[in-house]
UniProtKB/Swiss-Prot annotation:
EC top class named in words: transferase
Pfam name, any one: Pkinase_C
Impact upon substituting T444D: No effect on sensitivity to wortmannin and rapamycin
Lineage per the UniProt record: Eukaryota, Metazoa, Chordata, Craniata, Vertebrata
Biological source species: Rattus norvegicus (Rat)
Name of this chain's protein: Ribosomal protein S6 kinase beta-1
Similarity annotation: Belongs to the protein kinase superfamily. AGC Ser/Thr protein kinase family. S6 kinase subfamily.
Length: 525
């Protein structure tokens, strides 16, 4: 801005009011651009009066009445709006969803700031319990870091992370469908088309983690949640291993024994192939009612995982049997999914031949089970021994030393999506429960997995877009019949629609109606 020299030869002191006006315009988004006219550059006449020839669009500077103006109270809170400070008081405790050795998981409602009124799950961890063990500290930090890094339709979203003197808080999306474990306990076993849907979504989540250099290592029904629509969400990343890429081996002993790969138990070093063993163990659990290798105690279970032959029930289809044998190979190098194709190798197997992977990733495929929910706060899909407890977050009366707190520096996090509109609206649609719940009707009458008529073996043109590597079709192993103790006899038709069903001389076994799960893996419903 030009300054006119006074008659005494000196220039007047600069006027900063214009700069302040520009700064204020930045706050209120006011357009201060002036017409490009050299004759209107704040020229002052003698006497300090404004030149009346300035163009104001036909309206004089003082001709606007109050009816044209909006009153706005200027205060520190309205002008200097910084990022919202997240603390425990921002959330109202509603229900207890679960408990562990290091803390609790609550259902909460946000009562201040962005997302006011929205329901979340709040995981509260006690610092004093965590710092006792360096491994536990590493697991906690890994979970927070992984949840910040990974965004995927089938992985739980981290919304906030913050801490107080004695506690760590993870605010996660609330998954009202509960644990897949609950559905497995209620049903006993899943039909193959139902298991196929869940395993397909899980395989996509595992593949995404592996692309990020992350091994999940703790795949089990308890860590697989369902959202309100019935889609899968992987949770609990405390046992994940970060920064593991092709060829990298880790030796950490962790995870749930029944779903643990042999190379972890032998401490011989492991890589991402352990997740495909766990997927096979989970698949076996879904289709038979128990993990493939269980014993009376921890030692016997480990012995069976390392030495015992895999027994497959005769009622399984040939595709299911073949996939289980390829996933549950003790030699990790020859295990399906261990090659460069990773998830693409698994997804190319004929067991998944009905899956449209592009639609699955977009969550356009209808899940086989949709939770019956009465409201957004519904907790009916969670264990009642927790939900009936009074939700109380114990006082934060323990503060760690400054040196001990150093390990939790940088824990605080706010998701970039917090200021965006919620992508998915909550809806409640009454739906009849699956007929699989009624004894005597073990077969699902209509497969919920969508596929193109006549396309029984191809993965579709969309498969290559969902997976970076184009998978190759792997031939099934058809030689050899697995041994299994047959306690009952009867006929059970293949639950998965197959154009040319296998007619091998297999001795049929009825679907087990009583869960064979070990006692410590059961849930009292």
């Amino acid at each position: 801005m030009r300054r006119r020299r006074r008659r005494d030869g000196f220039y007047p002191a600069p006027d900063f009011r214009h700069r302040e006006a520009e700064d204020m315009a930045g706050v209120f988004d006011i357009d201060l651009d002036q017409p490009e006219d050299a004759g209107s550059e704040d020229e002052l006449e003698e006497g300090g009066q404004l030149n009346e020839s300035m163009d104001h669009g036909g309206v004089g500077p003082y001709e606007l009445g109050m009816e044209h103006c909006e009153k706005f109270e200027i205060s520190e809170t309205s002008v200097n709006r910084g990022p919202e400070k997240i603390r425990p008081e921002c959330f109202e405790l509603l229900r207890v969803l679960g408990k562990g050795g290091y803390g609790k998981v609550f259902q909460v409602r946000k009562v201040t700031g962005a997302n006011t009124g929205k329901i979340f799950a709040m995981k509260v961890l006690k610092k004093a319990m965590i710092v006792r063990n360096a491994k536990d500290t590493a697991h906690t930090k890994a979970e927070r870091n992984i949840l910040e890094e990974v965004k995927h339709p089938f992985i739980v979203d981290l919304i906030y992370a913050f801490q107080t003197g004695g506690k760590l808080y993870l605010i996660l999306e609330y998954l009202s469908g509960g644990e897949l474990f609950m559905q497995l306990e209620r049903e006993g076993i899943f039909m193959e088309d139902t298991a196929c849907f869940y395993l397909a979504e899980i395989s996509m989540a595992l593949g995404h983690l592996h692309q990020k250099g992350i091994i999940y290592r703790d795949l089990k029904p308890e860590n697989i949640m369902l959202n309100h629509q019935g889609h899968v969400k992987l949770t609990d990343f405390g046992l994940c291993k970060e920064s593991i890429h092709d060829g990298t081996v880790t030796h950490t002993f962790c995870g749930t024994i029944e779903y643990m790969a042999p190379e972890i138990l032998m401490r011989s070093g492991h890589n991402r192939a352990v997740d495909w063993w766990s997927l096979g163990a989970l698949m076996y659990d879904m289709l038979t009612g128990a993990p493939p290798f269980t014993g009376e105690n921890r030692k016997k279970t480990i012995d069976k995982i390392l030495k015992c032959k895999l027994n497959l029930p005769p009622y399984l289809t040939q595709e299911a049997r073949d996939l289980l044998k390829k996933l549950l190979k003790r030699n990790a190098a020859s295990r399906l999914g261990a090659g460069p194709g990773d998830a693409g190798e698994v997804q190319a197997h004929p067991f998944f031949r009905h899956i449209n992977w592009e639609e699955l990733l977009a969550r356009k495929v209808e899940p086989p089970f949709k939770p019956l929910l009465q409201s957004e706060e519904d907790v009916s899909q969670f264990d009642s021994k927790f939900t009936r407890q009074t939700p109380v977050d114990s006082p934060d009366d323990s503060t760690l030393s400054e040196s001990a707190n150093q390990v939790f520096l940088g824990f605080t996090y706010v998701a970039p999506s917090v200021l965006e509109s919620v992508k998915e609206k909550f809806s409640f649609e009454p739906k009849i429960r699956s007929p699989r719940r009624f004894i005597g009707s073990p077969r699902t009458p209509v497969s919920p997995v969508k596929f193109s008529p006549g396309d029984f073996w191809g993965r579709g043109a969309s498969a290559s877009t969902a997976n970076p590597q184009t998978p190759v079709e792997y031939p099934m192993e058809t030689s050899g019949i697995e041994q299994m103790d047959v306690t009952t006899s009867g006929e059970a038709s293949a639950p998965l629609p197959i154009r040319q069903p296998n007619s091998g001389p297999y001795k049929k076994q009825a679907f087990p109606m009583i869960s064979k799960r070990p006692e410590h893996l059961r849930m009292n419903l």
